[in-house]
Amino acid sequence: MSRRFGAYEVSRFVDGVYKAPVGHLIHRQGAEALAAALAGHQGETVDMDVNCFALSGPDGIWLIDAGCGTAWGAAYGHARAAMVAAGIQPADVGRVILTHIHGDHALGLIDGDRPYFPNADIAVPEADLGFFSSAEARKTLPPARQGGFDLAARLLDICGPMLRPIPTGRIAEDVEAIAMPGHTPGHTGYLIGNGDERMLLWGDVLHVSDLQVKDPGVGFVYDIDSALAYQTRLEALAEAADHGWLVSGGHLGGFFRVERQGDSFRFVSQPD
């Protein structure tokens, strides 16, 4: 799947499908509201694509996120072969831009004890790199949710000279970094293109799109600040709907337009 936005051809690559236990979902209004949101859902998991994106533009090949690589087993890492099949070799990638420091977005940067993309700068949101490099911040989360700190340490060890902290704002021609905090402190989306036709790659603003677009109060246990993640989700959906931007992200199954539907929203699938 690919579309042109401004100076860039944007292509989506699916690294695998994450089967999240239903128990990992939460709702800002409690258990009854979550049960209502899940009414009609079958099964004990919710399935979500794990995506990364290639931007082909004036400065060569860039990636938004890098998938899991081989770190999470054979169910993941498929984006690597898909990129090669599309003519993108690891050495062709000149820059990888992360939405945030979580394994399904950043572990694909690493191949054993070396960088997988040998010629790439790695752009990391400043606030995420600062948070996940902080021993004090680590103490604020339970052990089961400290993986980002271990990952940041690995990135600094293996890819340290390649890392480039980036602020929000314009980071390249037709690429704007937008703060979208909540899932992580430095969680960042990227607005690609110019004029009327733009694409917002919003990382993990939504995880379970069919549930959360109808009820943005549904959250995910790995949102570090669930209240802020909810507010960010509402703002992102509203802004995309009002501006007519296409959207995709770390776990959406394609490219979509957002439309208002009463007090909520809906997705309209877009062709590649």
Q: How should each PLM-predicted stretch be described?
A:
Residues 15-17, 66-69, 101, 127-128, ...:
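Active-site metal-binding loops of divalent metal-dependent hydrolases
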Residues 96-106, 180-187, 248-253:
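Histidine-centered catalytic micro-motifs
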Residues 2-86, 189-203:
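Conserved beta-strand hairpin/beta-sheet module of binuclear metal-dependent hydrolase folds
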Residues 74-123:
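Active-site metal-binding motif and surrounding structural segment of the metallo-beta-lactamase
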Residues 196-272:
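Cap/insert and terminal regions of metallo-dependent hydrolase folds
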Residues 36-46, 87, 146-150, 220-233:
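A short acidic, glycine-rich active-site loop
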Residues 62-64, 97, 122, 199-201, ...:
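Residue-level marker for buried hydrophobic side chains located in beta-strands
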